[in-house]
Amino acid sequence: MRTLTLLTTLLLLALHTQAESPQGSTKEAPDEEQDISVFFGGDKGTALQDAAVKAGVTCSCRTSSCRFGERLSGACRLNGRIYRLCC
């Protein structure tokens, strides 16, 4: 259940980030993979944040398929391009 909640939150975060991206960006993202940090805001720690820290969850935006040990968790947008979010 916690995993489902974490994945849902990551997906919503990716969609929210995509909606806030400025339109018409002229910069192109490099074709290399880029790591991103996921932060769960708020003054107090949440159970979801605590679970993510304990589990050591690290997510990356990947141009190709997810690496061994990672799962496709949604999509992320960098500089106007959409990538795979692998955690």
Curated annotation (Swiss-Prot):
InterPro entries xref list: Alpha-defensin, Alpha-defensin_C, Alpha-defensin_N, Beta/alpha-defensin_C
Tissues showing expression: Highest expression in bone marrow and to a much lesser extent in small intestine.
Highest rank taxon of the organism: Eukaryota
Prosequence residues removed at maturation: 20-58
Keyword check for Cytoplasm: no
Disulfide bonds: C59-C87, C61-C76, C66-C86
Biological process per Gene Ontology, one example term: disruption of plasma membrane integrity in another organism
Compartmental location: Secreted
Keywords, in A-Z order: Antibiotic, Antimicrobial, Defensin, Disulfide bond, Fungicide, Secreted, Signal
PROSITE patterns with a match to the protein in the record: DEFENSIN
PANTHER family found in the cross-reference section: ALPHA-DEFENSIN 1, DEFENSIN ALPHA 10-RELATED
Name this protein carries in UniProt: Neutrophil antibiotic peptide NP-3A
